[in-house]
């Protein structure tokens, strides 16, 4: 499962991660826009509150069920065909590194129609191309209802591009996650 957000989406994504049970059937990859200038203990805090192991993705680490992987600040997070991560320092995409688009497209190339991707609040259009790419691979694309988003730009951009996306309220997103647990 892929989760992406920027401004206004952090609290909702963190709440979703806190609610994931230890038997959640999918590995989770999270891309949030965060500054490289400020050290963060997001993973450490969430690890204590989630039923899953919450970690910062490490280069060459294999994607595994039972884990939530956060893309590190200032690196694009890619998934290789062997299921391992690569940290990439190429140019920012839409002023963002990590880029939601880059990670979502990379994972879609491997898992295609087996992907569930959810895009939340954000102040850029990053994520919209990745969601379209996943939709084109027949993955399940879920967009936060823009009316529920603190910053509507990101979900609106994805909604404009994705014609088959599920558009869900915050409560509906939680209910959906509960249904696959």
Regions found by a protein language model. Name each.
Residues 1-181:
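Conserved acid/base catalytic micro-environments in cytosolic active-site loops
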């Amino acid at each position: 499962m892929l989760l992406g957000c920027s401004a206004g989406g952090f609290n909702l994504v963190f709440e979703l991660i806190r609610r994931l049970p230890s038997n959640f059937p999918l590995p989770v990859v999270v891309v949030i826009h965060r500054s490289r200038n400020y050290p963060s203990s997001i993973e450490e805090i969430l690890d204590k509150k989630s039923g899953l192991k919450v970690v910062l993705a490490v280069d060459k680490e294999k994607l595994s069920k039972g884990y939530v992987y956060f893309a590190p600040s200032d690196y694009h997070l890619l998934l290789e065909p062997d299921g391992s991560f690569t940290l990439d320092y190429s140019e920012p995409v839409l002023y963002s590194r990590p880029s939601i688009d880059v990670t979502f497209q990379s994972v879609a190339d491997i898992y295609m129609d087996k992907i569930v991707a959810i895009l939340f609040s954000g102040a850029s259009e990053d994520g919209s191309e990745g969601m379209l790419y996943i939709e084109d691979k027949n993955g399940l694309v879920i967009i936060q209802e823009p009316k529920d988003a603190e910053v509507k730009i990101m979900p609106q951009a994805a909604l404009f591009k994705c014609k088959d996306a599920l558009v869900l309220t915050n409560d509906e997103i939680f209910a959906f996650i509960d249904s696959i647990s």
